[in-house]
Amino acid sequence: MKHIHKIKNYAMVGGLGVMAVFALNACEQNSGQNNALNNTLQNSQKNGAFVIVEEQNDGSYKVLEEYPSEQTRVMLKDKNGQERLLSQEEIDELIKQEEVAIDSGQSQLTNPNGGGLGLGGAILASAAGAILGSYIGNKLFNNPNYQANSQRNYKSPQAYERSKNSFNSAKTGASGASKTSSGKSGFFGGGNSSQSTSTNRNTGSMGS
């Protein structure tokens, strides 16, 4: 519980990242639990995300925890337990590298065997990826392998459920305001928010 409290405190800290909010074009959804978190994230308009990605002993990465936040930030926890916030430039470069892997069919996000994720893949698998990587969202959300593997990208089923519940609660709290909005709900596609995508995308220079 102390660890969870610490994470929530991080999520309240002022930002390093730049949040962009996007709308999602309606797309066909498969049934089953693995779609539940994706649906929740897509409908969490006006919420950023604070995400902790943890390095595993084999060098792969999983989503450890994530919470709604006013701004979108990603914290990396390495296998030695050291934590640091990733810069926006690092995040942008990692997402760009993972996009290349997706386009070439080499990304574990869309691999039917669902192997271990690299850091960029873990970021895209998280709520932060749904926001910051929204410009490649259709490549993932319309991919059946990504849908099937979504839960295993988290450290545990409990982490997956905590994320789903956190973003559901945030969505419920914001429902009153959303009724007055003419925009579509969700992260991807449409509306003025798409302008924020090109404004906020940086070209980071971090190596892989």
UniProtKB/Swiss-Prot annotation:
A lipid is attached at residue 27 (S-diacylglycerol cysteine). A lipid is attached at residue 27 (N-palmitoyl cysteine). InterPro entries: UPF0323. It comes from the Bacteria. Residues 148-208 are annotated as: Disordered. It is found in: Cell membrane. The keyword tRNA-binding does not apply. Residues 169-185, 193-208 have a biased composition (Low complexity). Its main location: membrane. Residues 1-26 form the signal peptide. This is UPF0323 lipoprotein HH_0014. Keywords: Cell membrane, Lipoprotein, Membrane, Palmitate, Signal. Belongs to the UPF0323 family. One of its GO terms (cellular component) is plasma membrane. It comes from Helicobacter hepaticus (strain ATCC 51449 / 3B1). It is a lipid-anchor.
